[in-house]
Each structure stands twice: as C-alpha cells, then as structure tokens.
Design a protein with these regions (language model features):
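Residues that mark the start of a beta-strand
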Residues: 1-5
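Active-site and donor-binding regions of nucleotide-sugar-utilizing enzymes
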Residues: 6-30, 35-131
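A transmembrane-helix-recognition feature enriched in membrane-embedded lipid enzymes
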Residues: 127-171
Length: 171
C-alpha cells in the first residue's frame, strides 16, 4: 500500500530536494502532497510532477488563515496522512509555532521535523498544549524575561555605585 505523505513547504527548495530524496529512498512510490504558498506552486510543479499541491495564500503560514479558509482545511483533511514533514532551512525550528499549530489539526499517523542537515525528529503535536503555550504562556515568558533583565541591570547599577562611589570615598 502506498503511503500518503504531506510536506508543508516551510523551507527553501534545496532542503525540500533533500527531503524528497529521503522520502523516495525510504518509501516505495509514495503519494506526496504539498502545502505551499501560491508563489511556490510553479516551482513545485516543475520539480515534482507527481505531487498534489494544496495552495495556501501568499504570506507566512498562519493557523487563523487556514482556519478561516474552510475549503482548504477540508480538502487537506480528506486524507489521513501516514507521515507529515515540517522542513526547515535552518538547524533549529525557531518561530515554527504557527506551522506546528497547523500540523496539529491535520489527520496524521506521525509528524516529523526535517532540518537543513537532513536530521529527522519525530514530533508529538497536541493542539491544546501548543495553543496554550503559544498564545497564553508566551506573553508571561516575555514579561518574566524582561523582569529578570531589569532586576539584573538594577543590581549591577547598585553594585557599581557602592563599589566605585561609596567605598572609594571611605578609603
């Protein structure tokens, strides 16, 4: 039975080429599907003639945009995917929260990240946890980091005043 594999085009084409090579080596004639912005569709059609493409509006991937576009969301979820890949043009997956939110709503068996060096990591995506961490915890983490930075600066200024102004006058 042929595997249904979905790739979200979140990386440059050199990484996508690496990923496609990996998929073709490890799977026998897979059904490959892409989610791509409108601007990348022609390049995907040129490179991968067999791929089915879900066209996402131009701009960055955003959960709210997909959620509003019911036709696109429904057409993506008609199939249960055996594997979903989230490629990155970088080693780390910083700022991929929106993409993870999108992937967590798609019917799938397994989800993998694929970085620019070809390292594959299986992901466990739970929509509720991702949404809570991204939408609610991020502001608290941001405020906490600002608070800690402010305290460190304040302590450094107090230390400087005591060491170089108060103690210097006593000697």
């Amino acid at each position: 039975m042929r595997k249904n594999i979905l790739i979200i085009r979140s990386a440059n084409f050199s990484v996508i080429d690496l990923l496609i090579d990996y998929i073709l080596k490890n799977n026998e004639r897979p059904n490959i599907f892409f989610i791509s912005q409108e601007a990348g569709v022609s390049s995907i059609k040129e490179r991968f003639l067999d791929g089915n493409i879900y066209i996402y509006p131009n701009g960055s991937f955003n959960y709210k945009t997909l959620n509003k576009n019911k036709h696109l969301a429904d057409s993506i979820n008609k199939i249960i995917y055996d594997e979903i890949y989230m490629p990155s043009s970088y080693e780390n997956f910083d700022d991929f929260q929106e993409i993870k939110l999108i992937l967590s709503t798609i019917k799938r068996e397994k989800t993998f990240s694929f970085n620019c060096y070809g390292k594959i990591t299986e992901l466990s995506l739970d929509f509720k946890v991702l949404y809570f961490n991204y939408k609610f915890m991020f502001p608290f983490k941001f405020i906490f980091s600002l608070l800690v930075t402010g305290i460190v600066c304040f302590i450094s200024i107090i230390y400087h005043i005591i060491k170089y102004h108060v103690l210097k006058n006593e000697v």
